[in-house]
Amino acid sequence: SQCADSIFAFINAQDADIICLQEFYLKDLQKLKSYLASKMKGYRAEYYMFPSRNGAFGNVTLSRLPVTGKGKIKFEESANLAIYTDHKVGDCRFRVYNCHFESYNISFTGMVRALFNADTDVFAETGTKMKRSILRRPRQVDQVFSDIESCPVEAFVCGDFNDNPMSYTYYRMTRGRKDAFVESGEGFGATYSLLWPMLRIDYVMV
């Protein structure tokens, strides 16, 4: 589609050696490798996708650097996960974690519609979704952090954390690492503007 083409054009323009994508969706899982190869020439793709009736979605890591190993960290009762790739450049070895922590799964348009219609059932369901996400995410974070702690090489963490810089998620994932945006960015660095124009929930920890 034109939208997908414009996104891939932007990604290619960044000229990054490693790219981490979350919530990547494709209708035909069988065509994923050829699709990525056509859009991201020169990159090797590592991924884990959850198949569904309407397609497949998951995490994708694209790399121009040699990949010496890979793995996944699946979360209990969740369609979210983390994948990692091991790399070797000269004598330097390191691992990149590509994380997607529990989402709230809340429809903004659905909330607005419920507000106008005074639909209390939707608000009750929203509360249940928020509670589930708030309970699951710290467990997922601890699971990834435990894997990082046992990692024999330097680890970098990227991903959609679905949490703000004042959260337990952020505190845990910055242990022993620096927030790349704080080190080199400026302004608020919003990555999700639908609910709040200054919300940052996506990170690169180095």
Residue ranges: model-predicted function:
Residues 44-61, 128-152, 156, 161-206:
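Active site of divalent-metal-dependent phosphoester/diester hydrolases
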Residues 111-130:
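A solvent-exposed, charged loop/short amphipathic helix patch at secondary-structure junctions
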Residues 3, 7, 28, 32, ...:
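Stable alpha-helical elements in mature extracytoplasmic
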Residues 2-5, 12, 18-109:
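Structured beta-strand-rich core segments of catalytic domains in phosphoester-bond hydrolases
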Residues 8, 86, 145-149:
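Generic structural signal for well-ordered alpha-helical scaffold segments
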Residues 1-2, 153:
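Mobile, glycine- and charge-enriched loop segments
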Residues 2, 9, 16-21, 27, ...:
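Catalytic domains that recognize anionic headgroups
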Residues 35-39, 113-115, 173-176:
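Glycine-rich, phosphate-binding/catalytic loops in enzymes
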